[in-house]
């Protein structure tokens, strides 16, 4: 995999729209640092798809340009598996809706970027 080149970045920005990406150093640092702060990752680009179609199109774009990615969900885990090591970060934070609650079967359908507290609140309601 390679670092994102200008053609990839232009296509990704067009795909995601102005709210769907960032190259701001503060935001990049935030997604590259696990919340425990045990160590520091790095990323050149933050992508925030708004839905599954954008996420799928972004993955295809990454594959076509040989750009590695690190997905991040709600970032409520303790294993730091979402820490990037030079890859772009694909943050699912814009995808956080509770899709359904099935009390009879004790199940929830929640989008990938929902933090654990969202699932807990939906289950309690």
Model region roles, listed by residue range:
Residues 1-64, 77-106, 121:
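N-terminal flexible segment immediately upstream of the FAD-binding catalytic core
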Residues 103, 114-125:
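Hydrophobic, small-residue-rich alpha-helical packing segments that form membrane-like cores
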Residues 72-76:
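Glycine-rich beta-strand-to-loop/alpha-helix junction loops that act as flexible
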Residues 51, 112-113:
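Short beta->alpha junction loops/turns
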């Amino acid at each position: 995999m390679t670092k994102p080149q200008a053609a990839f970045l232009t296509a990704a920005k067009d795909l995601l729209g102005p709210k769907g990406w960032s190259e701001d150093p503060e935001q990049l640092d935030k997604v590259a640092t696990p919340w425990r702060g045990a160590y520091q990752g790095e990323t050149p680009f933050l992508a925030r798809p708004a839905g599954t179609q954008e996420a799928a199109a972004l993955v295809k774009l990454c594959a076509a340009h040989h750009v590695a990615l690190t997905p991040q969900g709600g970032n409520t885990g303790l294993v730091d598996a979402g820490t990037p090591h030079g890859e772009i970060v694909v943050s699912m934070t814009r995808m956080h809706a509770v899709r359904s609650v099935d009390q009879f079967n004790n199940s929830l359908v929640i989008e990938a970027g929902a933090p654990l507290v969202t699932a807990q609140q939906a289950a309690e309601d």
